[in-house]
Amino acid sequence: MQRAAGGLPALFKAREAPARAARRQRGTGVWAAAVGLGALFCAALVQYLRVPSEGQWAGIFTPPTEIFCARRSRPLVCAHGGDSAHYPPNTMAAFAAAVAGGSDCLEVDVAGTRDGVLVVLHRRELEQMVRRVGVTVGDFTFREISQMDAGNGQRVPRAEHVLRKFSPHVETLIVDIKVDGRGALGAPKSMGAAALELAGATDCTNCILWAKSDEEVRHIQSLDPSQAVGFVVMNESSLDRLEGRDKLDRLAGAANVAMHHEVASGSVLEEVRASGRRVFGWTANTPYIVRKLLDEAPVDGIVTNYPRPLLRAIDERMRACLSEREN
């Protein structure tokens, strides 16, 4: 019998090649997973290190400035995802705690699942829940999302449930529309249209709808000019500037501006208010930022993960202003 060219060694090499490729692919997958978990760990560590101590928060309980006392009304305290300093963010427990603690405003992150259900969930929280980076709410069905643990046994709530339960108990409820889902809702309905339907279905007359996407906000305005909307002003990256999010004179008819704290200043607020708009500063999670938005750039509302100390600080400052006037 004639021996095949190359013999047994060639045969073994031919059989080994697919196995080596499979091992390389598995190795790449394991490496990618490790990198992703490492990124999540670093993000969690950075977030932990950013949490101010009780001693640091004491720095916001300072005598009010003339700028603060010149306010015509106290600023709204908008609990970012509820009282997310003490409860898992964007959960029913966090929103209930914020309302019970006196917050007069809630900021709610709303995204669409793959099968078109609106839920209250931020992409950042989802990545931590599934321990994977790069995923979006639109990658999952509502059934899959509803089975996830949002923290401490809490579940991801439907947006409808949150608005129905809590909008009657606050002055303002902000729906922050998230549009980063791949395949969420699908054409032709946009997230803006879905959020508008949500506000109408829940009779949320005190809802403000805003998003980083001007296109979505314009779509809402075209569907219902009477709906309160806002747009985001930020200048953190070249992409923000490329997409025009650093511009103040956008979206005629939008009465609310969600302004990143780094952009906020007395002169900028004066320019924005000249057009009759309200300004909400975000996200005030350090004593320095809180003092800036209270004393230097007096915004109309402050979005924060720490509503409790902020509420106390505002109360003390308002009393001090009143006492100063009486004297």
Task: Give names to the regions the model predicted.
Residues Q2-N327:
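Phosphate-group recognition and catalysis centered on beta-loop-alpha active-site segments
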